[in-house]
A protein has these predicted regions:
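Acidic-leg catalytic submotif of subtilisin-like serine proteases
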Residues: 138-159, 221-228, 306, 326-368, ...
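Acidic, Ser/Thr/Gly/Pro-rich low-complexity segments and short DxT(G/T)-type signature motifs
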Residues: 7, 12-37, 48-50, 55-59, ...
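Hydrolase catalytic cores
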Residues: 518-581
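Inhibitory N-terminal propeptides of secreted protease zymogens
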Residues: 120-307
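Secreted peptidase-domain scaffold signal
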Residues: 237, 587-677, 731-749, 753-758
Length: 759
């Protein structure tokens, strides 16, 4: 890839020439921009730079390593050029510290410019800025993302998100290994058609099972009708909690019931018997049955059928420190304890309910389970002289069966707005894409009462029940777009557990990132139990979600808002680079957006904002994005604004955006949970300069975080890269840092040597 350096005269005709004031360098590279190998970065200043100071004050780092550069001056000393070594690839930062002018005056105190070096086979047209790029290998039935610069004998395709530097116009490009332009949309459409030709309406997991079976063998299945529903069929109320189905929901329900009736008639004509114990729930149109392989193949040819999936009914189970490290205790002190919030723990058991108080239970005779005793107690318990859970005053429901009927009971009958799940099915760890349960939960999140669903990412270890070899090849167990998968960190939020599953699912552009978050699941004790695993990180996050909903009831009806606040408030990055740096670099991160933080989340939840509102340090909003609020430049016509207080030292801004997939039959393809809209997240400073971006293809969320300037105000901008569907979204932001009060109150006497030495 070749890029044209933008000169200082082209970009800035009138610089402030005062040399007595500290300056912000003007760069020809935008924050988080992708540049070519061996590129030159220019920094323009309003005064002459001292050559010796430039050599000492300017450096480029990749992680903790300083990389080789050639530094020179141009334009009579007003421009510093930094040429990168050809060997530099990956996420980097250009850092300027105490840069002096020729008269000895300090021109720059401190300046950081994050950017990425990614090899791209083709030439990027002049005037375009690259914001994201992935290298893909497309085979007969799937996509493999290659590492930056990696090559294969079969070739590759580099796919690029770029924008015009001055107009901001989005441009998508793709190049083959020879640098020739190719039509990536056409290639992906051909891939989708090849998959449809092979699998038809049969999910690939089920397809693989029946390929090894006899035509007369009976197989448990889940059948969905053909549905054509956008992710947001109506404008969901955003100013109050929806205590009953909104008016628009009634029209959706009518559509669902019509499709369900048609499917039921098809099953009857096919002489396929529904399971007797399956719930008669017309609001959730999928139906469980057992059918022969021959019946399944014939059923897949019926146009009333949306998809046929394998009905996996297996269930494999995956407190004081937990509460403290998530800072839920600080939220309790502020008066938020989950009062009035309905939370369900979805898993088999417990039969022993000592120190547990349930508002109701799915069945009165569940199986015995110490695992379920602990997951329930993490949310809420009444053990004497012990912490009472993350949401001690919530209404806790026991969906005490691994059967999905228990999940539907919790959502549709008990109207729970938070669901915690800490088990997985046999087929999920080895499945590279969404499985049957993922589709169901994505559907439930889109229908009243709009639950926020939190799940354990999974655990791997030698000898585990999943039997995947090597063990690190296990996929994150729950892959839905409209829910959250949670990893496991230690008691200090300083390290991820070595057993916490992190492998990302396979997607069209290979940049999906799971899990979304991490919470403490290591050596968690409550109610006489002590265990470790992501199983215990999930209920901790569910409890924190209940605290957020306690702050503002609107969040009970907006899982998109809950997801955004949880990710924006996760200010502790446990491992690797920032979320976006890991995504662009192709690093399969383990901690997602970071460690769950109830205190930070509550502070955000207390600051509900609105479109184009004055700037605040923290805030959140929810709503519907439709074509009516998208301009010709694909940017939303409204803004959110964040301000950085002057008395905050080392400030950082973190912003998260979350939206939904659609559970629908799309253009004649089988029903699936599909992202029909691709949103990006941009942040600009008061000069209009872009300071951060996150622009993945395959996620239902974006996260940006960057070092900010005190006293500055930033604009948060949503861009719709592709798609036309209306979609519900949530956005949240916060500024973190240190104040004088923080320094005075810091417990230096409790700081250990290990904490000081931690990288």
């Amino acid at each position: 890839m070749k890029t044209k350096n933008v000169t200082s005269s082209q970009k800035h005709s009138s610089l402030n020439r005062a040399t007595s004031k500290k300056q912000i360098p003007i760069s020809n590279v935008t924050a988080d921009e992708i540049v070519a190998v061996g590129s030159t970065i220019e920094l323009t200043l309003g005064a002459q730079v001292d050559p010796q100071s430039a050599q000492g004050a300017i450096r480029v780092v990749r992680g903790c390593e300083q990389v080789a550069t050639d530094i020179a001056l141009a334009k009579r000393g007003h421009v510093v050029t930094v040429r990168l070594d050809e060997a530099v690839i990956g996420a980097c930062e250009l850092i300027v510290s105490e840069l002096l002018g020729t008269k000895g005056e300090r021109l720059v105190d401190y300046y950081r410019l994050p950017f990425l070096v990614v090899p791209i086979s083709g030439k990027i047209p002049n005037g375009l800025r690259v914001e994201h790029a992935v290298r893909l290998f497309i085979d007969d039935l799937g996509v493999v993302r290659l590492a930056p610069g990696e090559a294969t004998r079969a070739g590759h395709v580099d796919v690029v998100k770029a924008v015009h530097r001055t107009k901001g116009t989005p441009v998508e490009l793709a190049f083959d290994e020879r640098g020739e332009r190719v039509e990536i949309d056409k290639q992906l459409a051909q891939l989708a058609q090849r998959r449809a030709d092979k699998y038809g309406r049969i999910h690939d997991t089920l397809f693989q099972r029946i390929e090894q079976a006899k035509e007369s063998d009976r197989v448990p299945i889940v059948v969905w009708p053909r549905l054509e529903l956008p992710p947001a069929s109506y404008n969901k109320p955003a100013d109050h909690r929806s205590v009953e189905p909104p008016e628009g929901e009634k029209k959706v329900t009518a559509t669902i019931r019509k499709a369900s009736a048609a499917l039921r008639a098809v099953l009857q004509r096919s002489k396929i018997q529904l399971l007797k114990e399956s719930r008669a729930d017309e609001d959730v149109p999928c139906m469980r049955a057992t059918a022969t392989v021959a019946q399944i193949r014939r059923l897949a040819e019926n146009k009333a059928v949306g998809a046929i999936l394998f009905d996996d009914v297996s269930a494999i189970n995956d407190l004081a420190d937990s509460i403290a490290v998530a800072r839920s205790d600080r939220a309790h002190v502020d008066g938020f304890d989950g009062t009035g919030i309905r939370v369900a723990v979805f898993e088999s058991g417990p039969s022993v309910t000592t120190n547990l108080v349930f508002a109701d239970r799915f069945t009165g005779s569940p199986s015995a389970s110490d695992h379920a005793r602990l997951t329930s107690a993490i949310v809420k318990n009444i053990e004497s002289n012990k912490p009472h859970g993350h949401a001690p005053d919530c209404d806790l429901f026991s969906a005490n069966s691994s059967d999905n009927d228990a999940l539907r009971w919790a959502v549709n009958d008990q109207h729970c707005t938070v669901i915690s799940q800490s088990f997985h099915r046999n087929s999920e760890p080895g499945g590279s894409g969404l499985q049957s349960d993922d589709v169901l939960k994505d559907f439930l999140a889109l229908r009243w009462p709009f639950p926020t669903i939190v799940q354990a990412a999974g655990n791997f270890f030698v000898g585990d029940e999943d039997g995947i070899i090597p063990i690190e090849d296990e996929f994150v167990n729950h892959k839905g777009y409209n829910s959250l998968a949670i990893g496991n960190h230690d008691d200090t939020a300083g390290a991820m557990s070595g057993s916490s599953v992190f492998r990302n699912p396979t997607t069209t552009h290979g940049d999906r990132e799971l899990p979304e978050l991490a919470a403490n699941g290591t050596s968690v004790s409550a109610n006489g139990q002590n265990m470790s695993g992501t199983s215990f990180a999930a209920p901790a996050t569910a409890g924190v979600t209940a605290l957020l909903q306690d702050v503002d009831g609107v969040l009970c009806s907006w899982p998109e808002g809950c997801r955004a606040i949880l990710m924006a408030s996760a200010g502790r990055n446990i491992r690797g680079g920032t979320w976006w740096q890991d995504v662009v670099s192709g690093v399969d991160a383990r901690d997602g957006a970071g460690a769950v933080d109830a205190q930070a989340g509550v502070l955000i939840a207390q600051q509900r904002r609105f479109r184009d509102a004055p700037a605040t340090r923290r805030g959140w909003d929810v709503g519907t994005i439709s074509s009516s609020v998208i301009g010709q430049d694909r940017l939303a016509t409204f803004r959110y604004r964040v301000t950085v207080p002057n008395l905050i030292f080392f400030p950082k801004v973190k912003v998260a955006l979350a939206w939904d997939s659609a559970v629908t039959s799309f253009l004649g393809f089988p029903l699936a949970s599909t992202l029909t809209v691709d949103l990006d997240l941009l942040v600009r400073d008061s000069r209009g300069v872009q300071v951060a971006s996150a622009a993945s293809w395959d996620n239902s969320y974006e996260v940006v975080e960057f070092t900010a300037r005190r006293g500055e105000t930033y604009e948060i901008i949503i861009r719709r890269w592709s798609g036309t569907d209306s979609v519900w979204y949530g956005v949240a932001w916060t500024v973190t840092g240190f104040s004088l009060v923080d320094v005075v109150a810091f417990p230096f006497d409790q700081l250990t040597v290990a904490q000081i030495q931690r990288p």
